[in-house]
Amino acid sequence: MMEKTVRRGTRTGFTTGACSAAAARAAVLGLVEGAVPEAVDCLLPNGDVVRFAVNDGACEAGQAAHAMVIKDAGDDPDCTDKAHLTADVRVLPGRAGEVVLCGGFGVGTVTMAGLGLEVGGPAINPVPRRNIEENVRAVGGPLLANAGIEVTISVPQGVEMARKTLNARLGILGGISILGTTGIVKPYSTSAYRASVVQGVQVAATLGHGVVVLTTGGRTEQFAMKERPELPAACFVQMGDFLRYALDEAVAQGLREVVIGGMVGKLTKIAQGETITHANRAEVDTQLLAELAARVGAPPDVCAEIAAAETARFGAERMQALGLGEPFHHALAQAVVQTLTAPDRYGDRFHLTVLVCDFDGSKITEAASGPAATA
């Protein structure tokens, strides 16, 4: 097994990129030494050297070799845990010093611009790409003096695993991405999802519509798609809790329109100034909801109930029962617009529309800012 911290609940793991680099290094050692080792010491992008167990080692007359490393994600609930990161390497006669990296079965193919990867090429991100080559060169020197080495990374379970990722939305088809900026997976880290949100905004920016639609989840995305049917699916990004990263990237990409689709809970947090809306970051400001309720005509006793409640949903349902659901949610949407377009936030860098739906995904209301400033 791979070496890592063993304290329950905090056991780190290794990225698909690190496992691919280890498999490639082991396979190249097979070319050089005539036998694939049962374990290999691999240099990670963060500078650590980690020993990985190697499986299915095989060599073919010094011209080709095969090795596989089983990904251990540690205590992180990663959909690529136990993936078989497989490297097939072969000698390229007459191409001294070249290392050619290819994607095999189960590694996605990039079909859209905006990801920093070649369209038509394998979804192997820049850091793992460099790390794989670095490990290949570290042990392949004797071969590379006179020939090149081709490395093909494949993942037998990659097509199925990719269905649990956002790859298809990002235009990465046919498998998973080979990822990892450090080589290490931290338990319950949000870095991978956060990166996918940023990538989603980047892809949306390449489509020429000048707009990205940010939603908090699947239900709000389906709702938003009904509201903006003229837009392709790649303009919609499930940002989860990561509004700040999505909006910062929208500004960086020069997008002139941003649409946010959400329900009362997340929208309340945004209205109160939170741009990372995870439940652990801040409590819902029910006093704010009570003030909005009062503004649209709720009686004082109801406002007091809303202020004392534990959830935003209580306030929404209480106002709906009074027949004040639409004006209440409209006031909330306006509060979101005012918060995000304040001069010390995003100002007029983009036109903002906030779409509000109920818990069944049906539209309640919307609010919008003034026109965006001319670029």
Curated annotation (Swiss-Prot):
Q: Which GO terms describe its biological process?
A: anaerobic cobalamin biosynthetic process; methylation
Q: Which UniProt keywords apply?
A: Cobalamin biosynthesis, Methyltransferase, S-adenosyl-L-methionine, Transferase
Q: A Pfam family this protein belongs to?
A: CbiD
> Domain of life here?
Bacteria
**E.C. code:** 2.1.1.195
GO molecular function terms here?
cobalt-precorrin-5B C1-methyltransferase activity
Q: Fetch the InterPro entries from UniProt.
A: CbiD (IPR002748), CbiD_sf (IPR036074)
Q: Which reaction does it catalyse?
A: Co-precorrin-5B + S-adenosyl-L-methionine = Co-precorrin-6A + S-adenosyl-L-homocysteine
Which top class of enzyme applies to this chain? transferase
The record's listing under SUPFAM superfamilies reads: CbiD-like (SSF111342)
In the record, the note on similarity to other proteins reads: Belongs to the CbiD family.
Output the HAMAP family linked to this UniProt entry: CbiD
Question: Which PANTHER family does this one have?
Answer: COBALT-PRECORRIN-5B C(1)-METHYLTRANSFERASE
Annotated protein name in UniProt: Cobalt-precorrin-5B C(1)-methyltransferase
